[in-house]
A protein has these predicted regions:
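Extracellular, repeat-based ectodomains that mediate carbohydrate processing or recognition
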Residues: 16-429
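Gram-negative bacterial Sec-dependent N-terminal signal peptides
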Residues: 1-10
């Protein structure tokens, strides 16, 4: 069980990020700006790529030289059901420089293609990966292993009754293979909503909440697993091997959180220099009506929890579909300082005018956070996603930003296309 400590938060000035405009994008809901895009932006050592839906719901790809303000943009031959905010686009580069794209998924057949040549924005034909268990796909995510191979995560099945599937791609043979058809099982009664992170050592961390039904109010608990061999075998935070698939009964729990706690699903996690995991989320305590951002992490004494505690506005999570929520699900980045790891938490909150905001600390354990804004104007219902590979290489936080609107459920707002922007910010400056 995690030890609990409230954090203190103060305002702080922040160096302005550098902003570039890519092009106009669909803004009638939050499909371009949901937190679970892995990735919205991705780069190799000299070129960065971006993906989004335009106003006609076409999948658009763009690229630029790192450091440049000029983007080359290409509208692909593919469209997606952008009216459903679940149907986000995910990108990743493999070790050979080929761009992989998955898009338009919410309990429907796999939609996947890759660039015709390394460095190209043109996509080849839509294709299968392994050709099995690809008929009901949601939440596609790519992760690049240190050797250039890729992992592809997705949920098979629906909310409240889905399983976590993992495929692996080999650039040398240009083929996908199945690693796990059912890494985390809901046993037909629930499903795991996960977040994952590949650390600098190549360890793959996964944490998740369970959901008992399609109603978000049934989210509960926070569980954890890790893999030291590229996703093949899995263990607890203490190194105890898991017998697969992992179930509600066999999972290691970082924190027990009851249903009806406004616990959100699909957030983010990171790891420090020693490979210790850090999970960002939000929920409310019993006896409080205000959900607060939290960081749950593992140290030598066990699982710990820090409550940032700076919010004042109440809200409640319940029902189905994409919710219009006054705060964004957070992204967390953790420094590689061995003794006193610091962190950056990126979020949006109506209390702060729905801007791109950050909370920073130089020492997660002491609970002192500084909060500031990276933008002056509102970004509507935006949630943070970023270039994981650029952050890993250089410590530059490159954020996908767009002012979008989300109507509760799967409604659409009557708004014009809004600029897709990239904000580059170095937290140390």
């Amino acid at each position: 069980m995690a030890a609990i400590l409230a954090a203190s938060v103060v305002a702080n000035a922040t160096a302005a990020p550098v902003e570039t405009v890519v092009g106009p994008g669909w803004a009638n809901n939050s499909v371009n700006a949901v937190v679970f895009r892995k990735n919205s932006l991705v780069s190799d050592r000299d070129t960065q790529y971006v993906g989004y839906y335009d106003a006609e719901r076409y999948l658009v790809l763009g690229k630029r030289k790192l450091g440049s303000t000029h983007w080359t943009v290409h509208r692909t031959q593919y469209q997606g059901n952008a009216a459903d905010a679940h149907n986000a686009i995910s990108l990743m580069l493999d070790g050979a420089g080929t761009l992989h794209v998955a898009w338009d998924h919410h309990n429907n057949a796999l939609r996947y293609a890759r660039s015709v040549t390394p460095g190209a924005l043109e996509l080849g034909p839509q294709q299968a990966m392994v050709g099995k268990d690809e008929e009901s796909v949601s939440y596609p995510e790519f992760y690049r292993l240190p050797d250039g191979r890729l992992l592809f995560f997705y949920r098979l099945g629906g909310s409240g009754r889905g399983d976590l599937v993992i495929n692996r791609y080999d650039p040398a043979s240009a083929t996908w293979t199945r690693l796990h058809t059912n890494l985390i099982t809901g046993e037909g009664k629930r499903n795991a909503y996960w977040q994952a992170f590949l650390d600098h050592r190549g360890t793959l961390h996964v944490s998740w909440v369970w959901r008992e039904s399609p109603d978000v109010a049934s989210n509960h608990d926070l569980a954890y697993a890790r893999s030291r061999d590229g996703g093949v075998t899995w263990e607890t935070s203490t190194g105890k091997p898991y017998v697969l698939p992992i179930s509600a009964a066999s999972a290691e729990y970082a924190l027990r959180i009851p249903q009806n706690s406004e616990l959100i699903n699909q957030t983010s996690m990171a790891a420090d220099a020693d490979g210790r995991p850090y999970i960002a989320s939000y929920w409310r305590d019993a006896g409080s009506s205000v959900p607060q951002y939290r960081v749950v992490y593992r140290d030598a004494q066990g699982w710990q929890m820090r409550n940032l505690g700076f919010r004042h506005t109440t809200f409640s999570l319940s029902g189905q579909g994409t919710k219009r929520i006054p705060i964004a699900r957070p992204q967390i980045m953790v420094s590689l300082e061995a003794e006193r790891p610091g962190a950056v938490l990126v979020f949006r909150d109506e209390e702060r005018g729905s801007k791109v905001s950050v909370a920073r600390t130089s020492n997660i354990a002491d609970g002192k956070w500084q909060v500031s804004d990276l933008t002056k104007a509102s970004v509507g219902s935006w949630e943070p996603s970023f270039d994981t590979e650029l952050w890993r290489r250089s410590g530059v936080l490159s954020l996908f930003v767009q002012d979008v609107r989300q109507v509760d459920g799967e409604g659409q707002a009557a708004v014009a296309a809004q600029p897709v922007r990239v904000l580059d910010w170095h937290p140390e400056q």
